[in-house]
C-alpha cells in the first residue's frame, strides 16, 4: 500500500490526500512517527493551497490530527482535534464517531453517548444522499448499545428505543444483527 501511495504522491506532489492516505496506512501498521511525518506533509500541502483549499481538505487535516492523537493514546488532544473537524463540517461522520471513541477512552461516557445519539438524530432530516446518513452503521449501533449498558438507568429500555428508531431510519440493507435486545 505504501509503495502505491508513494507512486501517487510522486505523480501528484501537490495533492495532500495522498500524504494523508499514507499517514493512515502508517497508523494501521502502528508506525506513529511515519504517520506524523505524512500528516505534517499533508497539512503543509493543504496550507500551501491557501484559499483554494476546500473545507473537506481542511477537515481532513484536523481529522488526521485527531486520529494520530487517538492512536497515540492522547485522548484529550484527539477530542479537541475532532471537535475542530466537526466545527468545519457538521456531517463529518468519521470525526464524530472517532470523537465518541476518544471520549470513551478519556472516561467520558456521557459525552460519547451524546455524540452518537446526535449523529443518529441528524439522520432523520438528512437527504437520502447526504453524508450524514452514513452515521447509521452497525459499529455505531453496537457502540451505543455498549454505552447504554454502562450509563442508562434502564439499559434494556434505552436499547429497545434506539433499535425502534434505527428500524425507522435505516436503509433496507442495514445489518440488523448488530441490534441488541
Predicted segments, located by residue:
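Active-site-proximal segments of catalytic enzyme domains
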Residues: 14, 18, 22, 29, ...
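Alpha-solenoid helical-repeat scaffolds
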Residues: 1-25
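Structured C-terminal portions of repeat-based eukaryotic scaffold domains
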Residues: 40-44, 55-181
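Repeat-unit-sized solenoid/scaffold elements
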Residues: 27-32, 179-181
Amino acid at each position: 500500500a505504501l509503495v502505491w501511495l508513494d507512486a501517487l504522491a510522486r505523480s501528484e506532489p501537490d495533492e495532500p490526500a495522498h500524504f494523508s492516505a499514507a499517514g493512515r496506512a502508517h497508523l494501521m501498521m502502528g508506525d506513529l512517527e511515519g504517520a506524523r511525518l505524512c500528516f505534517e506533509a499533508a497539512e503543509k500541502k493543504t496550507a500551501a493551497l491557501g484559499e483554494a483549499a476546500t473545507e473537506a481538505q481542511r477537515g481532513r487535516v484536523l481529522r488526521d490530527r485527531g486520529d494520530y492523537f487517538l492512536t497515540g493514546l492522547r485522548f484529550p488532544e484527539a477530542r479537541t482535534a475532532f471537535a475542530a473537524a466537526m466545527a468545519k463540517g457538521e456531517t463529518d461522520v468519521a470525526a464524530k464517531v472517532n470523537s465518541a471513541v476518544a471520549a470513551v477512552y478519556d472516561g467520558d461516557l456521557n459525552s460519547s453517548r451524546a455524540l452518537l445519539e446526535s449523529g443518529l438524530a441528524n439522520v432523520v432530516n438528512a437527504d437520502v444522499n447526504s453524508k450524514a446518513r452514513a452515521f447509521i452503521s452497525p459499529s455505531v449501533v453496537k457502540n451505543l448499545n455498549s454505552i447504554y449498558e454502562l450509563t442508562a438507568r434502564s439499559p434494556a429500555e434505552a436499547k429497545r428505543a434506539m433499535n425502534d428508531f434505527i428500524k425507522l431510519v435505516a436503509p433496507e440493507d442495514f445489518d440488523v444483527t448488530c441490534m441488541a435486545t
